Regions:
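Extracytoplasmic copper-binding redox domains, predominantly the cupredoxin/blue-copper superfamily
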Residues: 2-9, 15-125
Length: 125
């Protein structure tokens, strides 16, 4: 009697586990969203805009020094483990991918130019 119950239950559990493993096999993490930032005339994207993201969202920043003169810039995100990095000459680009934290406001800045930067707001929609 016990064998009659155990074998069908075991078979169902094995099939369920196989179905879950098969379903999860093809799911890679979503590609990060790309955000392009231009540094020129002591501003990011001309106006130092506020960016809005969702918790857990992966963002790939492509930050380019678009100065027409020999002005060096760098890029950091305070509180997200993205340090200033080396100075970027005009025409150079830095790429950084981050996963947004649960919530909060985070400053993005050029470390060498006070006032050059803005805010990233992480909140649920």
């Amino acid at each position: 009697m016990l064998k009659r119950l155990v074998l069908p239950i075991a078979a169902v559990l094995i099939l369920a586990a196989a179905a879950v493993a098969f379903a999860l096999r093809g799911h890679a993490p979503a590609e990060p969203r790309t955000v392009r930032m231009s540094m020129r005339e002591y501003a990011f994207n001309r106006t130092n805009p506020t960016f809005r993201f969702e918790p857990g969202e992966r963002i790939h920043f492509i930050v380019t020094n678009d100065e027409s003169t020999n002005v060096l810039h760098n890029f950091r995100i305070v509180g997200m483990n993205v340090d200033c990095g080396p100075p970027m000459k005009p025409g150079e680009t830095r790429e950084v991918t981050v996963t947004m934290p649960k919530s909060g406001e985070f400053a993005y800045t050029c470390c060498t130019h006070p006032g050059m930067g803005g805010t990233m707001v992480v909140t649920k929609k």
